[in-house]
Design a protein with these regions (language model features):
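Alpha-helical linker/edge segments of TPR/alpha-solenoid repeat scaffolds
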Residues: 49-83, 87-89
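Non-catalytic interaction/regulatory modules that flank or connect domains
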Residues: 78-192
Length: 224
């Protein structure tokens, strides 16, 4: 037995451990123990290295599984959008300020999409976490306006007193505006040839039916 060799292997194991080269560090310890099976410091070092290596491996495997699930879900959603003919696009650098995502109920084969209802007259909005593709615009508005919003104390905003629009986008990127009726299903909007589901988030614009100067000015921005 060469005591110097054991000490050198021990020092190497500690150095490799510090560099997070765990298999190599284990190898050094095991070689040292071949020369000195009862060396307790080497045994302790080997146990520490193996424990840390196992902990890191569990973290790595868990991360890989999470990333795999994310990839699988992304492919599933992309397939569902393509199957329905829904145009989608992503804005470079866009980071949503909400945690909600498009979901697919595989059993029912139904999509739900996080959706903003915007009220430009009051600079307010509502985020619907999961708007089901089979629900109508009217059904969603009835739920939203069941009670008066704080910004609408007179409860002027109700399904029958408002008009709902969605923005259109042609192949040239020109933005337009299209009115949508209360009985129209969300899926009908999503599959419209000029509708683009951008950044995994749907948007509807809700304004009063009443013709006011504000409304005329607002429509004029869209060339209406």
């Amino acid at each position: 037995m060469n005591p110097k060799n054991v000490k050198a292997l021990f020092r190497s194991a500690k150095a490799l451990f510090a560099l997070e080269l765990f298999p190599e560090a284990v190898d050094c310890c095991e070689h040292a123990l071949l020369n000195d099976p009862d060396n307790q410091p080497v045994k302790d070092e080997l146990a520490k290295i193996k424990a840390e290596f196992e902990r890191r491996e569990k973290i790595r495997i868990a991360k890989e599984l999470r990333e795999q699930k994310i990839r699988e879900k992304k492919l599933l959603i992309e397939g569902a959008l393509e199957k329905r003919g829904i145009r989608s696009a992503a804005t470079p650098g866009f980071k949503p300020d909400h945690p909600h995502e498009i979901q697919l109920d595989q059993e029912l084969d139904q999509l739900t999409v996080p959706t903003f209802f915007l009220y430009p007259e009051h600079n307010e909005s509502d985020l619907i976490q999961a708007f089901n593709e089979q629900d109508t615009i009217g059904e969603q508005l009835a739920e939203i306006f069941y009670e008066a919003a704080p910004w609408d104390p007179e409860h002027k905003y109700q399904p029958e007193t408002v008009q709902t629009y969605f923005e259109t986008e042609d192949q040239g990127g020109n933005i337009g505006l299209m009115k949508v009726g209360l009985n129209v299903k969300f899926l009908t909007v999503l599959t419209h040839k000029k509708y683009v589901l951008r950044d995994g988030l749907a948007r509807f614009i809700v304004v009063p039916k009443e013709d006011t100067q504000w409304k005329k000015d607002w429509l004029a921005k869209y060339g209406k």
